[in-house]
Amino acid sequence: MKNNNAYELYQANSTMVESPIKLVEMLYEGILRFCAQAKRYMEAGDIEKKVYFINRTTDIFTELLNTLDYERGGDVATYLTGLYMHQIKLLTQANVTNDTQKIDIVINVAKGLLEAWREVNADELMQYES
């Protein structure tokens, strides 16, 4: 238990020093990781863990929604709002119906978002590679 608390403290501190661009990258990576786990537990019939990881993924999309800047982001922010809301809807449907295909859709969207984010912000993200 002590190691788990130390890890959580490390994670909390590491997010305090990351740039907003790196944090968004980490959120997209978290979506991919949690969706994969939700799908695995869905296929295994472990309802409790499936729900846990779907909820974690939904929480990330909610956080991404909360950080959108409509003044600076304009049409892109509006588009992302609809996209994120649709992913939350798909996750909810996947949770209720145990439909792994809906999780696959969310995974594919998140992969595209992560790839685009990395491409647009390549220069700043390179600072975190070393």
Where would I find each of the regions flagged by the language model?
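N-terminal intrinsically disordered, cationic/polar leader segments
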Residues: 1-37, 41-44, 48-55, 62, ...
